[in-house]
Amino acid sequence: MLAEAERGSRSGAANLAGVAIAGCVSSPRLSAELEVLLDERDALIAERDELIEGQTAQIAAMERRLAELGDEIEVRDHTIAQLEAQLGQLQAAVAELRQRLGKNSRNSSKPPSSDGLAKPPANNSKKKNKRSLRRRSGRKPGGQPGHEGARLERVEVPDDHVEHEPDCCEGCGGDLQGAERVEEGEESRQVFDLPEEIALRVIEHVAVCRCCEDCGTVSAGSFPEGVRAPVQYGPGVHALGVYLHVFQHIPYDRARQLIFDLTGADVSTASITAWVDQAARGLTEFDEQLRQLLCKEPVVNFDETGARIAGRLGWIHSASTDTLTRYTAHAKRGTEAMDNAGVLPDFEGVAVHDGYKPYQSYEQAIHALCSGHHLRELLAAEEQGQSWASAMSCLLLDSNEQVEQAKAAGLEALAADLLAELHACYRAVIALAYEQNPGLAANAHKRMKRTDAQNLLLRLDQREHEALRFAHDFRVPFTNNLAEQDIRMVKLQQKISGSWRTDEGAKRYMRVRSYISTARKQGQRPIDVLAQLASGRAWMPAPAPG
């Protein structure tokens, strides 16, 4: 449009110039020169127009390219943002994987068996041994002064007596047959051993019949309870089969083989299975009494662990004291299973546990957290660069030492000033921890992804009194080791004999295991109480003294 307007103005100017020249200039020479100048001017104008058109095209091309570059930049910015987000996710995933790979039995709740074979040697000067959670006691290894110990002691009346005669005279080599015996110089030694043959003892029960001399009625005696068949195994064999399978975790077939090798009794696996089922059915009253006793205890340790039951993940729950143990099996881990077990809903004492959240729903109970779990988690946090964790570990261990010293001195609680100092130091460590984790305190109430160390910090902050319950109440243990040791048998059972095929089978197993564990804690021999159970008279637990 501009070029056409310019060409129009140029032609108009040329016409006017021509008119002016025609009117004003009559010289042919001047007219020719003027025409030449006008042609040159026209050529310059054309060249200019051509340059303008070229530059206009270049500008349009550059504008299109700029638009394309803008689109490319926008796409690249979006791609960069996506890559940065993916990088952040990958970095978080790598950190989480490193954290998982760094967990072992020392800095988490993983069992020692999960550590694998890649363990550093105990004495390796090239590698610094990792810090142990235990502190030196200052005592020498072995038995301590005043410890009674345990050893074989001679008996007054041995079962057998074997005399060893000298072959000949040690002085001259003469025959000593019929020579005088000198008892003053004799020495005797006793050997405790199994009998050469462990055979079954067959007892024949006869129901004697008597005829009354007065009326002529024939009366028969009654067989003992449990003697029902013409030929059967007795309660001792029943007890041995149940003991081997339930307490020693031996599979049914291997238990059968062991009984045969020891006694010669060729029992079947079906018989042992039936004996375990019979034992569980006979413990209904025992289980209810055990539950009631646990509900009345001042302090009970609780724990739970996963197990393979009926081809899926199930859960074994335990409630333990120094004298009582109760196991229950359930498909769930949380409050549904705890309600079904029946102890926590009626328990008003101190519940010691690992801090699993469903325990907190039982508000009528007093709660205490396991310091052993805290020490392991603090060690993991320290390995992740959280220096406050080391200070908290030292504080917990020092507090436990003070409690043990106070117990040894016959005290029932720490002095008020020591408790005040303990809580002040505790809060100081928590404050240091928040300084090393900025922004955590402000967002503590929000549901967001946090590291294990941050979750531990929030738990220690929000549940301070539960974490330090052991310092206020000397009945409360420092750790939940009692429950962890009791429930460890679940892992042993799975390693040795495998999982439970049915839900009912797991429940029966746990009931019999509760019976054996409680009996052992109260000084009873498992074989004896199992034989008593097989005879139809279940042993009943006694409440804790005091």
Predicted regions and their residues:
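Short, flexible loop/hinge motifs at secondary-structure junctions
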Residues: 1-229, 302
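Catalytic center-proximal scaffold of phosphoryl-transfer enzymes
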Residues: 2-8, 14-24, 53, 60, ...
